[in-house]
Structure formats: structure tokens, C-alpha cells
Amino acid sequence: MIEYADFECPYCARAHELMTGLAVRRLFRHFPVVSKHPRARVLAQAVEAAALQGAFWEMHDSLFEDQGRLDPPHLWERAKRLGLDLDRFEEDRRSEAVAERVERDFRSGIRAGVTTTPTLFVEGDAHPGVPTTELIDRLATARNGTL
């Protein structure tokens, strides 16, 4: 499954909640919709900076689970709580390499036809919006993490 999402999107947070605990292989792709969510790109870059210290999923989960606190002080608090080197985190977050990683994900979404977040691709089929009960059931019954 490939998931395109935006960390400020409330529908993405709901999708995250529904998919938590599913034993399916997930490829996450950043799709910051900055026209609606001005901090989305900064948050995506923070997740990629955390990834460089081995904490991608931890930062990812933290942002979706508490969208009410996405401002810089809370972002640093999260990084500290995850045990990240804060100087390195900040340097990486502002780096060209991290910005390019986020932009590459976004461009891949455009090429794939993503127009809204979240959008899931399961077995090549696009599923825009919050996943349906049927899709969640299908993902929940996947064997060995694959469909």
C-alpha cells in the first residue's frame, strides 16, 4: 500500500487512526497541501529529519496523533522526547536533501493522479479520502503484510 498524506490534514489523521495496527506493508509519501495547510511542508521535512536519526514512524505517529500541537515549540518537544540530536535535527530539517525528498514524494503523487489527501494506492487502485470500512477490512485480512 502506498499512502499519500499531509500532516495537517484532519482526514489523514483519521485515516492514520483507522490504519493503526494493520499488518500491511505501508509506503508513506509526503503530499503537503500548502494551500490549505501552511505548515505541512515543514512538518514533512521534520519527519524526514527524524528519519535520518531512525525515528521516521515515531515522528509520523506523533504528528498525526496530536494535530493540535504542530507549532515549532511542540515540534522540538517531540524531537527531544524521541531522543533526537536537536542540532542535527534542525540542520537536517532545513537541508536541501530533505526538502528534495519531500518534493520528490509530492511530484510522484502528482504523476500518480493524487488530488486529495489522504490517497491510498492498494494493488494499483487509488482510494482517495478516508479509507472505507470495506478497504480497512481488506487491509486487516491481508496475509504476510501483502495484498
Question: Residues of each region from the PLM?
Answer:
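C-terminal cap of thioredoxin/glutaredoxin-like
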Residues: 3-5, 11, 16-21, 77-147
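Structural alpha/beta surface segment adjacent to cysteine/selenocysteine redox centers
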Residues: 2-80, 90, 147
